[in-house]
Design a protein with these regions (language model features):
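Extracytoplasmic/secretory soluble proteins
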Residues: 1-487
Length: 487
């Protein structure tokens, strides 16, 4: 905007992007004008993922304590309250499987593609001890999911996704449960190992394991599930009134000779029926309205979802239903269509049980519920589980547009320092050695000027927080009064 690269959408909206002028987008557009206009009050961006992500959780919830369901059942489903319990459960599953895969190779507890710093703390964000979300994207100043308080993930070692994960991976390594290839493995290499059944647990729910096994046995229980725990943050009820901004956004180039064609594309995607199309398929082919005006998926679509897995590559190839958002999809799955139902009809509570695969159905019935998400909701609404309903860090950082270069350099240097210590921390042979390495890391961070970067970022965050927090709390109160996605 400083260089006049982005076109002012307010000037062309009525004629060229009329769908964006709909009241459906008023909250988002007003927030973008407030937080991402460079002080002009104009609209320059469109964003994906608006609504409430994972309203009422999700039957394939991807974050938290992830285990291989068949083995977890085999060892008696012990409770997982914290990372210590998790490591013990992982060890029991490896032992129950005899320590080897079907092909006879070594069975590990977990592996990650650890070629960047972010790989080594993505899991830790969803452990309640930290409970943070990406805020200053790519850096360790992250907001608490509970109340939006900015936490210093470099130095506050008790509330840092990085330090939580360093302790966890150190415990895993010393127990012989962490794949040593984790330090050098690429994402594609990890994916192949997951498909081969190399791990009994996963940093996130990786459906590749199940998707491979279900092709051989439609009733397989060999796949990953998330075990709800008071020690983890559940990825549910995530209010995204401004989508995934400021990390994800689209703008029209002010210098383009073809901006009108680009505006047509944006207008097309902001037709709410297009988001329904992306998540639920073609009206008349995959779903239609019944006599009461309720959108209903067709039985054959449920059958394919059950057999192949909604959102899987096989399901997409068979039905043409993508089942996921991309950068120009304005709404998330559990955003509300003007007809009053979710954009993804698969996420309606009346439909969730119909679309379950055999493994997820077995998980739900084992715990006495119709769906995994119904089990999750019972814990959420009874106050036993922390969710993302308090996350507002994204809205706050939307208003922080110009981080000084010297501050960016300090934070980048701090990231480099942390990454340099990862291998030493993970492979430390004792608590004493781990603590000594951590102390030296803290000294290096201090010498790099981390305190100066923290001062600037915390002050900028506080200023933006003051502006946007009252708006968020009003939206939060409205949602909590009538939470969506409940049985």
């Amino acid at each position: 905007m400083t260089n006049n690269m982005a076109k002012n959408l307010d000037e062309i909206m009525e004629e060229h992007i009329p769908n964006l002028a709909s009241d459906l987008y008023k909250t988002c557009n007003d927030l973008l004008r407030l937080q991402m206009s460079g002080g002009t009050g104009n609209l320059y961006f469109v964003v994906p993922g608006q609504g409430v992500e994972y309203a009422g959780s999700n039957d394939r919830n991807i974050r938290g304590y992830i285990v291989r369901w068949d083995l977890y059942k085999q060892i008696g489903m012990p409770e997982i309250k914290n990372d210590e319990d998790y490591v013990n459960v992982i060890a029991q599953m490896v032992e129950a499987a005899g320590g080897v895969t079907k092909s006879g190779s070594t069975l590990y507890g977990m592996g990650i593609s650890g070629t960047s710093l972010g790989d080594w703390y993505a899991r830790g964000r969803y452990i309640a001890e930290a409970g943070t979300r990406p805020t200053f994207e790519g850096y360790l100043y992250e907001a608490s999911v509970k109340d939006g308080t900015l936490l210093n993930g470099y130095t506050d070692m008790d509330h840092s996704a990085f330090w939580v994960d360093m302790r966890f991976y150190n415990d895993m390594y010393n127990a012989g449960l962490l794949d040593p290839d984790s330090f050098t493995m690429t994402g594609s290499e990890l994916g192949e190992k997951v498909k081969a059944g190399t791990y009994v647990a996963s940093r996130t729910r990786d459906n590749n394991l199940y998707n491979v096994n279900v092709l051989e046995d439609v009733n397989t229980l060999e796949g990953y599930v998330m075990i709800p725990s008071e020690g983890a943050v559940m990825h549910a009820d995530f209010l995204t009134p401004c989508g995934y901004a400021p990390g994800d956004y689209t703008f029209l180039s002010a210098s383009s000779d073809n901006w009108e064609a680009a505006a047509k594309v944006i207008n097309f995607y902001h037709d709410p029926d297009v988001s329904r199309l992306i998540y639920s398929g073609i009206q008349g082919t995959h779903w239609d309205y019944d006599a009461d005006g309720v959108p209903q998926l067709k039985d054959e679509v449920f059958q394919k979802a059950t057999e192949l897995g909604y959102g899987s590559e096989a399901f997409f190839k068979e039905t043409g239903i993508w089942g996921g958002y991309w950068e120009l999809t304005p709404w998330c799955e559990t955003g509300s269509h003007p007809d009053g139902y979710f954009y993804s009809l698969f996420q309606e509570q009346t439909n969730r049980a119909k679309a379950l695969n055999a493994m997820d159905k077995d998980f739900a019935t084992t715990y006495g519920f119709a769906t995994p998400s119904a089990y999750h909701v019972s814990l959420i609404d009874s106050g036993k589980i922390t969710t993302l309903v308090g996350e507002r860090g994204l809205l706050v950082t939307m208003g922080i547009t110009d981080i000084p270069l010297d501050v960016q350099r300090i934070m980048t240097n701090c990231n480099d320092i942390l990454f340099q210590y990862v291998a030493e921390l993970v492979t430390a042979e004792s608590d004493e050695e781990f603590n000594a390495i951590a102390a030296q890391c803290q000294t290096d961070l201090a010498d790099a000027g981390e305190a100066d970067a923290w001062q600037w970022c915390s002050e900028a965050y506080a200023k933006s927080f003051e502006v946007v927090n009252p708006i968020f709390e009003e939206l939060q109160a409205e949602y909590l009064a009538h939470p969506a996605g409940r049985p």
